[in-house]
Amino acid sequence: YERKHIGILEQVRRYVHLPVIVKLGMNLTNPVALINQLYANGAAAVVMFNRPYRPDIQIENVHFHAGEMWTRPSDICDALRWVGICSARIPNLGYAVSGGVHDGWAVVKSLLAGASAVEVCTTLFWNGPHRIEVMKEQMMQWMEEHGYDNIPKEWKTFLSGKQNDDVVFIKNLMQIATLLIKAAHQKFKK
C-alpha cells in the first residue's frame, strides 16, 4: 500500500514540472520511512492527514449512509504528533496540518509542531470565509503576547525534537499506553 505512494509520485513528477505535495492518509505503518522515501523521490511537501469518507449504518432502514463528515478541534492531535516527529527527522521537506484546524491557536500549534502550512475546511463551512480573519487575529494575539513580530524560522523546529525532548516523551508515552492496553487485554482474557 505505502509503495503505491512512491509510484504515483514518480508518475506525477514525470508529467508535471511543479512542486508536488502528497496528502497522506492516517493509517500508515511507518510514516517516517514513507515520508523519507517521498522526499528522496522529489516530493516538495506532505499534508498530514487526509480524512477519508467515513460511512455509517442506518440501523432503522439497514443501509449505509454518510457518517460524520466534519472535523472537531481534537482531530488535530495525530497530525501535530506526526508533523513534530517527521519534521525532526526529515527537516528539509514542507509539512501541512489538515483536520481539526478550527482557530488561530490551532494554526500556532501546527507551526510550533513543524508545519509551514495548514488546511482549513470545516470551520469555513460553519463560520464562513470571514473565519480566516478571526483565525489570523487569534494567531497575531498569541504572537504579540509571546513577543513575536513575525513567524520565525525557529518555529519549524521549536517542538520538533531538535530543541527539546517532547518527541521522546510522546514516543515513551505511546509505548507505555500500548503496554497498559496489552496488560489490560491479557487480564480480561483470563
Question: What kind of feature is each model-predicted range?
Answer:
Residues A45-P55, G100-V101, A106-V134:
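Glycine-rich phosphate-binding active-site loops on the catalytic face of alpha/beta enzymes
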Residues H5-E10, V32-N36, L80-G84, V107, ...:
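Generic structural signal for well-ordered alpha-helices
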Residues P55-R72, L111, L124-Y148:
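C-terminal helical cap(s) of enzyme catalytic domains, especially alpha/beta-barrels
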Residues L28-N41, G84-Y95, V101-V118:
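Catalytic cores of alpha/beta
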Residues D75-A106, I170-K189:
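Active-site/ligand-binding-proximal alpha/beta "capping" segment
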